Curated annotation (Swiss-Prot):
It comes from Thermobifida fusca (strain YX). GO terms for molecular function: rRNA binding; structural constituent of ribosome. This is Small ribosomal subunit protein uS11. Residues 1-21 are annotated as: Disordered. The gene is rpsK. Belongs to the universal ribosomal protein uS11 family. One of its GO terms (cellular component) is ribosome. Part of the 30S ribosomal subunit. Interacts with proteins S7 and S18. Binds to IF-3.
């Protein structure tokens, strides 16, 4: 049987047009396994994002503060190409890369206006999973 042609099977990838946003929001989601940094405009449309896995860390190294630092730097550099200079930071989750990611946003040249913790806390909602016994 002859191999099927892949013509038209792939998606067309085009570069996003350059936005001109001066003030944005940096959303840092830091879990026990990974850190994801998204930089959005004030309406919530994503300008740039990066995660520890996307930057090149795999497995348990994704959960380190250094991986969070590298992810925040990568997201900040891409956001600066779109004109972002100031950010308000929203941190979510209990992970180890929270403070490191905020510091690296400042180190790359973004001016941090405010920092808010938006970790969701249940008002006694769902029953949590049973405790791990190792």
């Amino acid at each position: 049987m002859p191999p099927k042609s892949r013509q038209g099977a792939g998606r067309k990838v085009r570069r996003k047009e350059k936005k001109n946003v001066v003030h944005g929001h940096a959303h840092i989601k830091s879990t026990f396994n990974n850190t994801i940094v998204s930089i959005t405009d004030p309406t919530g449309a994503v300008i740039s994002w990066a995660s520890a896995g996307q930057v090149g860390f795999k497995g348990s190294r994704k959960s380190t503060p250094f991986a969070a630092q590298m992810a925040a730097e990568a997201a900040a550099r891409r956001a600066q190409e779109h004109g972002v200079r100031k950010v308000d930071v929203f941190v979510k989750g209990p992970g180890s890369g929270r403070e490191t990611a905020i510091r690296s946003l400042q180190a790359t040249g973004l001016e941090v206006g405010s920092i808010q913790d938006v970790t969701p806390v249940p008002h006694n909602g769902c029953r949590p999973p049973k405790r791990r016994r190792v």
